[in-house]
Design a protein with these regions (language model features):
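Bacterial N-terminal signal peptides that target proteins for export
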Residues: 1-7
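Bacterial signal peptide processing site
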Residues: 19-22
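Conserved beta-propeller blade signature
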Residues: 42, 88-90, 98, 133-136, ...
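Extracytoplasmic beta-rich repeat domains
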Residues: 38, 45, 68-82, 107-130, ...
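Blade/loop signatures of beta-propeller domains
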Residues: 32-67
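Short loop/turn segments that connect beta-strands within beta-propeller blades
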Residues: 101-105, 147-150, 187-191, 227-230, ...
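C-terminal motif of bacterial Sec signal peptides marking the signal peptidase cleavage site
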Residues: 14-17
C-alpha cells in the first residue's frame, strides 16, 4: 500500500496547468488545432471517452522520428503530461512538477516538493483542465482545484478514501472513483457532492464519459453505465456471472467508441459491451494479465480497432466490431501500460526491455524504436510527439 500524500503535496498540483474540452468519442471531432496551431491532449486518454487517439489524415507525425531534446523529472512519470496550447505539464510520482513550453523547452513553472515519505509515491493520478481550472486527485484522498493561469488555490477537499482514479470533467461536474467502491460526481466550482454511486468493488480505473453517461468498472468483475446528471444506473454487467467468465478485476479504464464500451480485466480478458445495454458483444483472451487501458481508433485504411498489450509481451490489434485479432506483435517484455495511437502509428512500451515501439496500425510492422519506456508511451501537441520515458519527457520530431 502506498503512503498517502500530505495536504502540502496536494497543493503542488495547483501550480501545474493543463487543457481540456468536451470532445467526441474517438477523438475525430477533437483533433482540430487551436488558433495557435496546437492540438490539446488535456487528460489521460486525451478525450472524455478515453480513446487515447489523435487522428491525422496526413502522415506528418508518423515515423521516421528523431530525438530533439530530453527533460529529466528525477522520478517515475506514472501519467503522461497534459498538454494545452503548446505547454506540457509533467508531474512525477512524488508530486514534483514542471510546466514546459514545448516550442523552446522553457520551464514556466517548477515545483520542488519534498515527499512525506521518500520511499513511497504521493501523486498517482492524471490532472485535468476544465473551464480555466486545474483539478487533480491524490492517493491520500485529497482532491484539489486551482486557477490554471495563476496557480492560486480555488478549493481542496479531503475524501475518506484512497484515489487512484484520474478525474474527468464534463458539464460543470467532476467524476472519479474511489477504493471505497464509490463513483462520485462533484461540483467543479467548489467540490461539493452532486451524487454518489456505490459499486460492488473498488474503483481503481478512471471513469469515462460519452453521450450523457459515465462508464466505469470495478475490482469485483462489474462494468456499468450511470446517468451523468443523476448517477442512476443505466446498466450493470457482472462479467463473473456471464458464462464462461469467472472472477476478474477491472484495472483498465473503459474506452467508448463505435457504440461499444471496451475494457480489460486483469486476468487478460478484453471485453466489448454494448454501449446502450451493457450486453457482452465479444471477448478476447490476451493470454496473460492486462493492466493497461485499451486504445481505440479507426485509422485510415484500417477497420475500427482496439489496441492493447499484456504481461506476456504480446501486443494486439483487435477488430473492434468482431473481437477477432487483426495482428499480433511480440514486444519482448511485459506491457504494463496503455498504448496511444497518433496518426497512422500505434505506440507501446515495456519496462523490462526499457523500449518504446511504434507499429504501423494497418500491418503491425515496426516503424519506430527507442531505448526509453514509460506507462503511456507517447502524446502529441499536433506539431510534435513527446515520448514519456521512465524519468524523462523526450521531444521527437520527424526526420
Amino acid at each position: 500500500m502506498r503512503v498517502a500524500a500530505s495536504l502540502t503535496l496536494v497543493l503542488a498540483l495547483l501550480l501545474a496547468g493543463c487543457g481540456s474540452s468536451d470532445e467526441g468519442a474517438t477523438g475525430a471531432s477533437a483533433s482540430k488545432a487551436s488558433s495557435s496551431g496546437y492540438v490539446d491532449w488535456p487528460l489521460f486518454g486525451r478525450v472524455p471517452a478515453r480513446t487515447h487517439y489523435l487522428p491525422r489524415q496526413e502522415r506528418a507525425l508518423d515515423p521516421p522520428l528523431k530525438q530533439a531534446w530530453s527533460i529529466n523529472t528525477h522520478a517515475l512519470i506514472e501519467f503522461p503530461p497534459a498538454i494545452h496550447d503548446g505547454v506540457a505539464y509533467v508531474i512525477n510520482k512524488y508530486g514534483n512538477g514542471k510546466a514546459v513550453r514545448l516550442r523552446d523547452r522553457k520551464v514556466l513553472w517548477e515545483l520542488n516538493v519534498r515527499p512525506s515519505d521518500k520511499g513511497n509515491p504521493n501523486f498517482v493520478t492524471g490532472p485535468v483542465y476544465y473551464r480555466g481550472a486545474v483539478y487533480g486527485a491524490f492517493l491520500s484522498g485529497h482532491l484539489a482545484a486551482g486557477d490554471a493561469k495563476t496557480g492560486k488555490k480555488l478549493w481542496v477537499r479531503k475524501l475518506n478514501a484512497h484515489l487512484e482514479s484520474s478525474p474527468l470533467a464534463v458539464d460543470g461536474t467532476l467524476y472519479l472513483g474511489t477504493d471505497t467502491t464509490d463513483v462520485l460526481a462533484l461540483r467543479a466550482s467548489d467540490g461539493k457532492t452532486r451524487w454518489s454511486f456505490n459499486a460492488p468493488g473498488a474503483i481503481k480505473a478512471s471513469p469515462s464519459y460519452h453521450d450523457g453517461n459515465v462508464f466505469a468498472a470495478d475490482y469485483e468483475s462489474s462494468a456499468f453505465a450511470l446517468d451523468a446528471k443523476t448517477g442512476k444506473p443505466v446498466w450493470r454487467t457482472n462479467t463473473s456471472k456471464v458464462p464462461p467468465y469467472g472472477h476478474g478485476g477491472f484495472f483498465s479504464s473503459p474506452a467508448i467508441a463505435f457504440g461499444r464500451v471496451y475494457a480489460a480485466r486483469d486476468d487478460g480478458t478484453v471485453f466489448a459491451f454494448d454501449e446502450q445495454t451493457g450486453k457482452v458483444a465479444w471477448s478476447f483472451d490476451a493470454g496473460d494479465y492486462v493492466y493497461g487501458s485499451p486504445a481505440v481508433a479507426r485509422v485510415p485504411g484500417t477497420p475500427p480497432s482496439v489496441y492493447i498489450g499484456a504481461e506476456n509481451g504480446r501486443f494486439f490489434a483487435i477488430d473492434a466490431r468482431t473481437g477477432k485479432p487483426r495482428w499480433r506483435y511480440d514486444v519482448g517484455g511485459p506491457v504494463p501500460g496503455t498504448a496511444t495511437v497518433i496518426g497512422h502509428t500505434v505506440y507501446t512500451s515495456s519496462f523490462k526491455t526499457q523500449e518504446t515501439t511504434g507499429l504501423d496500425a494497418r500491418t503491425g510492422k515496426r516503424t519506430f524504436h527507442i531505448k526509453q519506456a514509460g506507462y503511456t508511451p507517447m502524446v502529441s501537441d499536433g506539431k510534435r510527439l513527446f515520448l514519456v520515458g521512465y524519468y524523462d519527457l523526450i521531444g521527437l520530431e520527424p526526420k
